[in-house]
């Protein structure tokens, strides 16, 4: 739907516009994954992304972003401070993802910021900050 129906409609109305994905949590992971799978996007805002997802590091290490992209990533500074063993990996995985993206030739700009708080603190503000950053 996104590539076959939605994007052609957007491009017909705004032919010169760049297309960025924006996501928080699992949608942040999806936004990043879409850059690895499709050439139709110019970047993504990925806030508090679910990069703890099993085998994500392996996937990201074996793939390249498909087209020149600007990427904004952020994470709350308390998100990795949890007793949940899976969720506690999110900080290391996010730092690792940033390193992978720095080495990707199609990543033209990469922003990575830490925000105060946990996963559920001010998601709208965090997303707005990311959008402002990549469009700024």
PLM regions: where:
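Non-catalytic cap/lid and distal C-terminal segments of serine-dependent acyl enzymes
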Residues: 1-136
């Amino acid at each position: 739907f996104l590539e076959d129906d939605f994007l052609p409609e957007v491009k017909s109305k705004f032919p010169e516009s760049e297309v960025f994905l924006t996501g928080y949590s699992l949608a942040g992971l999806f936004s990043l994954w879409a850059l690895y799978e499709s050439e139709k996007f110019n970047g993504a805002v990925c806030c508090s992304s679910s990069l703890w997802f099993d085998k994500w590091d392996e996937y990201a290490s074996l793939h390249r972003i498909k087209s020149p992209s600007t990427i904004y990533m952020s994470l709350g500074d308390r998100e990795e401070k949890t007793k949940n063993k899976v969720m506690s990996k999110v900080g290391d995985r996010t730092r690792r993802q940033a390193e992978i993206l720095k080495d990707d030739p199609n990543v033209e700009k990469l922003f990575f910021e830490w925000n105060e708080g946990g996963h559920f603190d001010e998601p709208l503000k965090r997303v707005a900050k990311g959008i402002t950053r990549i469009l700024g």
